[in-house]
Amino acid sequence: MARAIKGLAILALLVGSGAFVACSSDGDNASNPTPTNDGGPGGNDDGGPSGNNDGGNGGPFTPPADPGPGGFWVTVSGEDLASVGYDWTSSSLADGDPPGFVDGWAVTFEHVIVTVDKIRVNADPDKDEGNPQDVGAVVASADGPFAVDATIGGNVVGKSGSPDEKTVPIAAFSKQSNGQAFDPATRYAFSYDLVAAAANAKIVNLDAAGLVLYEEAKQKGWSMIYAGTATYKGPAPAGGSVFEKIPTQVKFKLGLKNPSSYINCQNTDLTATGDEFPRGIQANASKSTTVQITIHTDHGFWDKLNVEGTPLHFDPIAANASTYGTPSSPGTVTIEDLVNVDVTGFKTKSGETLPARSLVSDYTAPAGQLKFDTNGTSFAQANSFAAYLAYSAASGGHMNSDGECEVKNNFTP
């Protein structure tokens, strides 16, 4: 599977009106950094071809060709998990690769749609080691926005090498915006934004159903969409329990308002120093270098915020499905159904207490009611599950599979 690097804690750092989420091995909260040059857009010269048909307003988009030796080819991937999903068997593990949902659910996606914008390549990724958001000047950039379905993907081999990882190119840089070649001996900072669905988005690979979803996303301001089906595969629940009332198949549509910037990402294609990978991308004089924007779909289902790799749960979503109480009837859940669900004490759609449970061998569920840990994060609507999901999923933007980025949340949770 695509991912084996885990255990980094995510730190929430507030800068002005945006929240920064950084990654650290010690889990300590860092102090607020000073305002920085975060590699934001510095002009529209893309430094090379980035597709010759803009695909705006629902039109066709031509993915850019390989830019050739010395260039950077930017792709988007949801890993193989966006394509094949998360299976569940009696041998599934919370800490498996991929992780299993601890409550017995297999989850597959029909659509994982994101809108990518403001791709930028900057000089000097190590300008300030204490404040990685501070980078050098923009040397190449590409503006979208690009509407991408990571479940559909494209024809470029993903970083995992798995045939199920489908990745699609959205931009290419053959040279710097000043016409000079990228220096193969130099690393360049790489950053990108995930933004709200936009009317002028370049439609990269959405199918008919994806286009319908994207229209809804434009109306509602979603920047991420997780849409799919969850199927319960665990053992039969105890008679009379609330679990017996949960439908065994649930179709979900989770539209998330969580636009964020992913700044100066670490690069797991390069050699680590200790536990830390270098930041930035590096050209190869003999061939192009693929730079993969990677969306980790597991982040949206974690049970604790600002910490990497906590257990995955689907029970609190399924327990609020439309057919709760008639388990043989497939149910549906939308993000609107979860707005008033309190993560500090989950209840079913009918108001019953939802207990915590574990159906995997490497995780012990706490006694009593299922609760998620906001870990110091507050929400405009206190403890809203919809807001929790959006905030947690926003931490899922990476580079080259597992490269951690400095994450600036451009939204109020």
Predicted stretch roles:
Residues 1-22:
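Sec-dependent bacterial lipoprotein signal peptides
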Residues 1-4, 33, 39, 46, ...:
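Intrinsically disordered, low-complexity sequence elements enriched in Ser/Thr/Gly/Pro
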Residues 20-66:
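Ser/Thr-rich, Pro/Gly/Ala-heavy low-complexity intrinsically disordered linkers and tails
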Residues 16, 40, 127-128:
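Alpha-helical transmembrane segments and their juxtamembrane interfaces
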Residues 58-413:
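A short, solvent-exposed, low-complexity linear motif enriched for acidic/polar residues
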